From Swiss-Prot:
This is Deoxyuridine 5'-triphosphate nucleotidohydrolase. Belongs to the dUTPase family. It comes from Rhizobium etli (strain ATCC 51251 / DSM 11541 / JCM 21823 / NBRC 15573 / CFN 42). This enzyme is involved in nucleotide metabolism: it produces dUMP, the immediate precursor of thymidine nucleotides and it decreases the intracellular concentration of dUTP so that uracil cannot be incorporated into DNA. Pathway: Pyrimidine metabolism; dUMP biosynthesis; dUMP from dCTP (dUTP route): step 2/2.
Length: 156
């Protein structure tokens, strides 16, 4: 169930020249957590991503993420499953004080070249609350049952 706030945060966008004609980022279903981001590549020159290659793709927009929130750029499950296309540095964080064009770092982990055309939905962005912790240095870590065990220490 999606929780609807009385006053959801407002996401202001600035459309850049390379974003002209592209749809605004949008939630594709009523319960969608992420809004789809589209490729702002040149319409006359689609980008071909060969297996093993990566590319930084423009979205054509500057996002003003509200203070106290972040934008999390994540892969689209269909592109990942069907073609091996994913976002590196996932989730990528768009901080609330960043004012440049949002770009998506895509990688082709599949076995075939993948063509990215203008307006194609390439990733999704989730707007999420941020907590900044107070950082303090201590002399020793507190004891726990788990201790320093990691990387499979609780079972696989």
């Amino acid at each position: 169930m999606t929780i609807h706030h009385d006053t959801p945060p407002t996401l202001n966008l600035i459309r850049l020249a390379n974003g002209e004609g592209l749809d605004l980022p949008a939630y594709e279903s009523k319960g969608a957590a992420g809004m789809d981001l589209r490729a702002a590549v040149d319409g006359d020159a689609p980008l071909t991503l060969a297996p093993g290659e990566r590319a930084l793709l423009p979205t054509g927009f500057i996002f003003e993420i509200p203070e106290g929130f972040e934008g999390q750029v994540r892969p689209r499950s269909g592109l990942a499953f069907k073609h091996g296309i994913t976002c590196l540095n996932s989730p990528g964080t768009v901080d609330s004080d960043y004012r440049g064009e949002v770009k998506v770092l895509l990688a082709n982990l599949g076995e075939e070249a993948f063509v990215i055309e203008r307006g194609m939905r390439i990733a999704q962005m989730v707007i999420a609350p941020v907590t900044q912790a107070r950082v303090t240095e201590i002399a020793a870590a507190s004891e726990t049952a788990r201790g320093a065990g990691g990387f499979g220490s609780t079972g696989v």
